[in-house]
Amino acid sequence: MGNRVSREEFEWVYTDQPHAARRQEILAKYPEIKSLMKPDPNLIWIVTSMLLVQLASFYLVKDLDWKWLMFWSYAFGSCLNHSMTLAIHEISHNFPFGHHKAMWNRWFGMFANLSLGVPYSISFKRYHMDHHRYLGADGIDVDIPTDFEGWFFCTTLRKLVWVILQPLFYAFRPLFINPKPITHLEVINTVIQVTFDVLVYYVFGVKSLVYMLAASLLGLGLHPISGHFIAEHYMFLKGHETYSYYGPLNLLTFNVGYHNEHHDFPNVPGKNLPLVRKIASEYYDNLPHYNSWIRVLYDFVMDDTISPYSRMKRPPKGNEIQE
């Protein structure tokens, strides 16, 4: 149902991603930005507090009627769990403990992962590094939808369904685009997570377990914060590959909206990205950006020129080394 989109293919490009060149140019002009490339130990206490709040919510919802449980799962738990996935994004860049304590960050990522209900942090780290190094590379960057997604989700209604099911596509897309051997850390992540889920079930009951899982599924689907999935790299304007968002939801998402700044300087923690924009304002103020993720979701669904195919894609160069 709804109009069919006009785009029937990805936007193939044969140039390098813009972020490395812009990073070099900005650092040559503003070397003080290097001082922003440092750990953010505040993440340790923020993440711990978020997990404790979610544990408290497990107790508060355990005896609710199902309708109210689902209401609070969407209205509250989803915000907390989506925010936690973006905390895990910060952790994947080694910001809590720094690069010299990489394994501390991996263990902390598994700790942050607990409230999500499904193992996520270790696999995300492996694929997210590819996303930065090989942005848009065919068969490597699993942030790019599959051809099936672009072909099938091609009407207004189907695009809405695609948005609702986004967490499932992000979970299973790597298996089709860029499958990797399972590592021992992924096994450990899974064992820890399943053990925690079983404990939630035995301590709080099935309703708390459903609340936790539904919060992740709903929070990563049709949800205001989920606008960042589409806002970051979907090509609403031809020739522009990455877009920043400067609205209030950055307060809940560790400034993930500062996405041009993040790709230009992936070693700068989220709390310092507004300073990058302030220092090098002439490089960012004139780039296309958003102020509403809700509007991004609406435009994606309703605009007949936008679809899962609206991504810039590059052929792999043949020398990519993946972990």
Swiss-Prot record:
Motif (Histidine box-1): 89-93
PTM field: Myristoylation can target the enzyme to the mitochondria leading to an increase in ceramide levels.
Single GO cellular component term: mitochondrial membrane
Residue positions of motif Histidine box-2: 128-132
Coiled coil residues, start to end: none
SMART domains: Lipid_DES (SM01269)
Domain of life: Eukaryota
Subunit structure: Interacts with RLBP1; the interaction increases synthesis of chromophore-precursors by DEGS1.
Location relative to the cell: Mitochondrion membrane; Endoplasmic reticulum membrane
Motif (Histidine box-3): 259-263
Catalytically driven reaction(s): an N-acylsphinganine + 2 Fe(II)-[cytochrome b5] + O2 + 2 H(+) = an N-acylsphing-4-enine + 2 Fe(III)-[cytochrome b5] + 2 H2O; all-trans-retinol = 11-cis-retinol; all-trans-retinol = 9-cis-retinol; all-trans-retinol = 13-cis-retinol
UniProt source species: Rattus norvegicus (Rat)
Protein family (similarity comment): Belongs to the fatty acid desaturase type 1 family. DEGS subfamily.
Membrane-spanning parts: 41-61, 68-88, 104-124, 152-172, 184-204, 210-230
Keywords: Endoplasmic reticulum, Fatty acid biosynthesis, Fatty acid metabolism, Isomerase, Lipid biosynthesis, Lipid metabolism, Lipoprotein, Membrane, Mitochondrion, Myristate, Oxidoreductase, Phosphoprotein, Transmembrane, Transmembrane helix
Function description: Has sphingolipid-delta-4-desaturase activity. Converts D-erythro-sphinganine to D-erythro-sphingosine (E-sphing-4-enine). Catalyzes the equilibrium isomerization of retinols.
Primary location class: mitochondrion
Protein name: Sphingolipid delta(4)-desaturase DES1
E.C. code: 1.14.19.17, 5.2.1.-
BP GO annotations: ceramide biosynthetic process; fatty acid biosynthetic process; myelin maintenance; positive regulation of apoptotic process
Lipid linkage positions (N-myristoyl glycine): G2
